[in-house]
Regions:
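Active-site nucleophile loop of the alpha/beta-hydrolase fold
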Residues: 164-174, 239
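Short beta-strand/loop motif that positions the catalytic acidic residue
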Residues: 201-202, 207-213
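Short alpha-helix in the alpha/beta-hydrolase fold that links the catalytic acid
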Residues: 194, 203, 217-226
Length: 274
């Protein structure tokens, strides 16, 4: 009788764990849109291939604006080919843009994991610097959603001139708790704990938050903002998690953040302050 009861408890816990594992897996593993081939996004002249330290080929786009140009490294969200953010590089001819798909995303080889994504990002920044020819005048890092987790870890190690985060979170595990309360903290290791890395970041940080974001809700962004040694500039966009890119003010705001790390002067009216 006791064995039967214990078995039922174990099975119940396993059933509860399934949606938690599913949510965390969804946060980093590619889906339909990430599986889209790079050719769908065009701009063949800028298509590029970088080799990771283990030989895995990472593919995407490298907009090399020439020796001494600032370098912007862009990290996208889950279920997203980085080609979806090419408009940013096309709107800015003054900076070099490194926009590579994560392992297993787009045309990139391999299987993603948190440690591999961060290691790949740092290695490819070093290679991009070499290809530019001489040190870039500055390094700027942009991260969206899961890419904000990558961006925070890279920024803590690389000391960029600016860090721009779009729909960022405190940790994936904490976000998962919104969907399955408590269990992620009890049953899974924490992943992409951005609040652990934020205290090491000394460059200006700009955060663009979506007002109608139901995936990364405001408390998770607020918890991250509190972890930085200097309060970031925070702006709220009238969009949801997946539609921030389509706002006419999105690209101007990101480009503005690269100039100074925080905003001054007039802002698009749709972007409210803190």
């Amino acid at each position: 009788m006791k064995k039967t009861r214990l078995l039922k408890i174990v099975l119940f816990l396993l059933l509860l764990l399934i949606p938690v594992v599913y949510l965390v897996r969804l946060s980093i593993f590619p889906g339909f849109f990430a599986d889209r081939p790079d050719a769908m996004y065009g701009h063949e002249a800028y298509r590029s291939e970088f080799s990771a330290t283990d030989g895995t080929l990472l593919r995407g786009w490298f907009f090399n604006r020439g020796q001494g140009s600032p370098l912007v490294a862009v990290y996208t969200g889950n279920n997203m080919n980085v080609g979806g953010m090419l408009a940013l590089a096309l709107a800015d001819m003054s900076r070099s843009y490194l926009m590579l798909n994560y392992r297993g995303y787009g045309d990139s080889e391999g299987v993603p994991s948190e440690s591999r994504l961060v290691a790949d990002a740092r290695h490819c920044i070093a290679e991009a610097r070499r290809r530019i020819g001489g040190q870039p005048s500055s390094l700027h890092i942009v991260g969206y959603s899961i890419g904000s987790g990558v961006a925070n870890q890279v920024a803590a190690a690389e000391s960029p001139a600016t860090l721009t985060l779009i729909c960022p979170f405190d940790s994936i595990t904490e976000v998962a708790c919104d969907f399955v309360p408590l269990l992620p903290r009890l049953l899974l290791p924490n992943t992409f704990v951005s609040t652990d890395f934020a205290p090491r970041i000394t460059c200006p940080v700009t955060v663009l938050r979506a007002a109608a974001d139901t995936l990364v809700t405001a408390p998770h962004t607020a918890a991250l903002l509190r972890a930085y040694p200097t309060p970031p500039a925070e702006y709220v966009l009238q969009a949801d998690h997946n539609s921030v890119f389509f706002l006419p003010e999105f690209i101007p705001l990101v480009l503005k953040s690269l100039e100074k790390g925080s905003f001054s002067g007039d802002l698009p009216t749709a972007a409210a302050g803190k």
